[in-house]
Amino acid sequence: MNTNKRICIIYTGGTIGMVPSEHGYVPKAGVFEPLLRSINDIHRPEFPDWELVEFSPLLDSSNIAVGDWNKIGRVIDQRYDEFDGFVVLHGTDTMAYTASALSFMLENLNKPVVFTGSQIPLCMLRSDGLDNIVNAILIAASGRVHEVCLYFGGRLLRGNRSTKMSADLLEAFDSPNAPHLAETGIDIQYHDTVIRPK
């Protein structure tokens, strides 16, 4: 992995950053970066450099609107030349819709924009957020994809072909009518024949 790669992580809200409160798990401003820095893998020398942009207020993905899509697009546009790729952390309820919208909004894209999130908050035991965010960052830094996509539960999907299939399974998303762009296992296996050329 090229350690000079720079990835912009855009935290819009969602389950991945929720923390416990007297009312259950809730989103809370300012707590996600410490959670992110607690992940051992991101301190490895071969891991890409990254910078976090946190939305204020954090978005409830069940209430996301066109204006929120525009805001995400503007954040990417304003930082486009500074970074090699983007990871958008988003609630799962409408992640596929936002990824699809951004795929049409971001014209002539030649860098990866990878959406991800989690079914279990990052602060909890067994959180799927750990795998999802680490692999999403590595995919964004790989230079192998140049489009809006969605990584979740070991699958890299084309953003505008993805859909949420389960509210409970960790493999929550799929693209039933389109092949996966990649899968993760011991290695990240890219399917170059279905990835759009740069």
What are these regions (language model features)?
Residues 7-9, 113, 148:
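Conserved hydrophobic helix-helix packing surfaces used for dimerization/oligomerization
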Residues 1-78:
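ATP/NTP phosphate-donor binding region
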Residues 18-19, 94-99, 129-133:
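Short glycine/serine/threonine-rich phosphate/pyrophosphate-binding segments
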Residues 13-14, 87, 136, 154:
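Buried hydrophobic positions in well-ordered alpha/beta secondary-structure cores of metabolic enzymes
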Residues 115-185:
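Internal gly/pro-rich beta-alpha loop/helix module
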Residues 81-85:
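Short acidic/histidine-rich motifs immediately flanking catalytic phosphotransfer sites
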Residues 4-6, 10-14, 35-44, 158-198:
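Accessory alpha-helical/coil subdomains and C-terminal extensions
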Residues 88-111:
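Short Gly/Thr/Asp-enriched flexible loops that form oxyanion-binding sites at enzyme active sites
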